[in-house]
Amino acid sequence: MKGIRGISQLSTRLYSAQAARKLDVAAEHVKFQPQDVQVTKLPSGLVIASLDNYSPASRIGVFVKAGCRYESPDNQGVTHLLRLAANLTTKGASAFRICRGVEAVGGSLGVTSSRENMIYSVDCLRDHIDTVMEYLINVTTAPEFRPWEVSDLTSRVKMDRALAAQSPQMGVIEGLHGAAYKNTLSNSLYCPDYMVGHVDADHMHNFIQNNFTSARMALVGLGVDHDVLKQVGEQFLNIRSGMGTAGTKAQYRGGEVRVQNGSSLVHSAVVSEGAAVGTDEVMAFSVLQHVLGVGPHIKRGSNSTSKLIQGVAKATADPFDASAFNVNYSDSGLFGVYTISQSAAAGDVIKAAIGQVKAVASGVSEADLTRAKTQLKAEYLMSLESSEGLLDAMGSQALTRGAYHSPEVIAQMIDSVSATDVANAANKFVSGKKSMASSGNLVKTPFVDEI
């Protein structure tokens, strides 16, 4: 658009008889002072977080503690449909108006979800915040879920399931959670087959009513004034007060799931219970993950510095891949190794990868510890360079802690992790009850009790 305006102004200038004005080269440039993230918690429990980064583009998100872990046996898959229902008719705007209204200002509206949270976000030019904010508030607070519109989502649910089925990694990770937990976190991100076509408008309304309450929400903005965001929260996101339905604490049990198919590659994940968000050991597990290796840091690189790659390479001459797996939730976590190998070498690869974790449990060198900390800090800081990554970091912390830790504080927390902390984290994996998920030709793949 900038280029188009420039051309328009140029054509006007060509037909003008007036002399062009001289630029005042001595005029001072406007200097913007760097801003810090501002966080406010309203009496209703709603958290407002914002950062005015002076960007011409703004990004606003509503974070809700309403992931699939809060589904019950009666409404399994409801969060999957909510992801697809963001553009359906609301009490304040039709589906057509939402679609065309956001499109008309060059904005975008999207929904993502995890096992913990649902995130509704909008992007737009700074001048159109009011317009897209109206649609964001409508979608999150006043959905109608007309039965015929909900019914039309069935084909999209089936498509999502079919696309997910084509990803071995997705199948293994979903199966791993189902095997590892007795409840809550065992729920899938996708609607189970037996519920496809059976999640109706009543299920969706009840889930919204019980989980989309002020105390379970955070309104987060980039490139927006904090007072404006606070006013929006006070006026429009306080319609449902209270804590909503109390979530059940996750119960780790350990288990195994095996999916036998004709693939020549075996995907396998072996984990123990890890660290929950907010605990002292969560940072130690993150450093341990980078000590072991999380993938190449150079495009098309060999990842030769990874301890997992080094260890497994001694056990097989076949192609393989191995990385540390680490995921953290509000009350639990999973830590272990994820391997991809030829079916004939699966057993050797898995056992060699676990052997590397055992080696770290015996001690880690200062050089490896320093390298892992540097990689972790770089990964975190680079994730904040995109508006999406920064908004996610702000929203996740606001929803979990009601506050925001600056990158400097996070870096200090990483630096404070000692070699003993990392060894203790590795020992927790080694001694913990294992969970395992595998897919492929599993003839040579060991069972969880054999490793």
Which role fits each region the language model picked out?
Residues 300-303:
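Divalent metal-dependent phosphate-bond-processing catalytic cores, especially two-metal-ion Mg2+/Mn2+ enzymes
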Residues 31-33, 250-253:
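Short solvent-exposed loop/turn micro-motifs enriched in small/polar/acidic residues
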Residues 45, 52-102, 176, 280-293:
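Active/ligand-binding-proximal structured segments within catalytic/core domains
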